[in-house]
């Protein structure tokens, strides 16, 4: 009887304690969810700590009497059942807290791993900023490829291809062929053909330069003329655009005039003698074909030979004795 009474009293006190906790929780809905989540874990954590300190031997000793005594085992099961029944209100309390507005924090607790709090993230960011760009590792520049030294063994062109000694090769796309020797490439410049004088575009990508475009016109005094075109610059001057791009001009050959006072007319190349053939008698101009008395004692005339007037600028003059009055 005394043991039954004690058990009844214990059960009643446990029920009263659970009822009081529920009333306090319902009256105060602002209890942090973290404390509610940590509350059921504390007994288990203390048990694990005791178990780790006591060791597996102590746990076996505690479990053996419970298996040996059937009645005690049943009491333990009944007590554990009552403990589970007491935990049911805690789960209902969590659901009520989530429905009252604590869902966001509860979600944070489920997503965020233990120890990864906003304070820890802020400290990590501050530590990263404190390092600064000075201590940050800088990438090393890539090493340039260095061709090995093939002197005495071969020759290398611009692309890195190796040629054996005695082989002919072109060091580059615009280089002339070379002979690979033990001393290095031996290159001889061949005799290249001369470029056209009218070439205006030269290709130098090969060993010998080549003309890709020639000029087919001439420029003379601000005007453009086609190849082999003839043109007149003045009445006496004719020009021609040659194949080499140069302009050659010739002046018309005018016959020698039969006078000493020729006149140039517009649009005519050669001068003409408007006053006919004549010549100079000292400073005076006398007509040809007759004798002209320049003074009382001097007679002059222009020379005439073989039917043409001989070009003599000065007349032939003879002086006679004359009486003085």
UniProtKB/Swiss-Prot annotation:
Residues 44-56, 64-78 have a biased composition (Basic and acidic residues). It comes from Homo sapiens (Human). It comes from the Eukaryota. Residues 153-212, 216-274 form the VWFC domain. Residues 1-27 form the signal peptide. Peripherally associated with AMPAR complex. AMPAR complex consists of an inner core made of 4 pore-forming GluA/GRIA proteins (GRIA1, GRIA2, GRIA3 and GRIA4) and 4 major auxiliary subunits arranged in a twofold symmetry. One of the two pairs of distinct binding sites is occupied either by CNIH2, CNIH3 or CACNG2, CACNG3. The other harbors CACNG2, CACNG3, CACNG4, CACNG8 or GSG1L. This inner core of AMPAR complex is complemented by outer core constituents binding directly to the GluA/GRIA proteins at sites distinct from the interaction sites of the inner core constituents. It holds the Pfam family VWC2L_1st. Residues 37-121 are annotated as: Disordered. A motif (Mediates cell adhesion) lies at residues 114-116. One of its GO terms (cellular component) is interstitial matrix. The keyword DNA-binding does not apply. The lineage of its organism: Eukaryota, Metazoa, Chordata, Craniata, Vertebrata. It is found in: Secreted, Extracellular space, Extracellular matrix, Basement membrane; Synapse. The keyword Kinase does not apply. Keywords: Basement membrane, Extracellular matrix, Repeat, Secreted, Signal, Synapse. Coiled coil: none annotated. This is Brorin. PROSITE patterns: VWFC_1 (PS01208), VWFC_2 (PS50184). BMP antagonist which may play a role in neural development. Promotes cell adhesion.
């Amino acid at each position: 009887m005394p043991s039954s009474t004690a058990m009844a009293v214990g059960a009643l006190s446990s029920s009263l304690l659970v009822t009081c906790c529920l009333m306090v929780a319902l009256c105060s809905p602002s209890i942090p969810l973290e404390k509610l989540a940590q509350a059921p874990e504390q007994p288990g954590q203390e048990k694990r700590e005791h178990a780790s300190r006591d060791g597996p031997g102590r746990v076996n000793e505690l479990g053996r009497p419970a298996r040996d005594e059937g009645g005690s085992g049943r009491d333990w099961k009944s007590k554990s059942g009552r403990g589970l029944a007491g935990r049911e209100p805690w789960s209902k309390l969590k659901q009520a807290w989530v429905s009252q507005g604590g869902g966001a924090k509860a979600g944070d607790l489920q997503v965020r791993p233990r120890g990864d709090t906003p304070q820890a993230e802020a400290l990590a960011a501050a530590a990263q900023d404190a390092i600064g760009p000075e201590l940050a590792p800088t990438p090393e520049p890539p090493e340039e490829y260095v061709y090995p030294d093939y002197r005495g063994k071969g020759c290398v062109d611009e692309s890195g291809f190796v040629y054996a000694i005695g082989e002919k090769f072109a060091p580059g796309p615009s280089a002339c062929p070379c002979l690979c020797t033990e001393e290095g490439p031996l290159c001889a410049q061949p005799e290249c053909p001369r470029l056209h004088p009218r070439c205006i575009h030269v290709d130098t990508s090969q060993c010998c330069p080549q003309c890709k475009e020639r000029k087919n016109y001439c420029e003379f005094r601000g005007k453009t003329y086609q190849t082999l075109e003839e043109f007149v610059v003045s009445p006496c001057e004719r020009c021609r655009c040659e194949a080499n791009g140069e302009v050659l001009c010739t002046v018309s050959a005018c016959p020698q005039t039969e006078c000493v006072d020729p006149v140039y007319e517009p649009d005519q190349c050669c001068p003409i003698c408007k006053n006919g053939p004549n010549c100079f008698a000292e400073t005076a101009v006398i007509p040809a074909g007759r004798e002209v008395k320049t003074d009382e004692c001097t007679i002059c005339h222009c020379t005439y030979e073989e039917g043409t007037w001989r070009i003599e600028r000065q007349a032939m003059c003879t002086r006679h004795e004359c009486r003085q009055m």
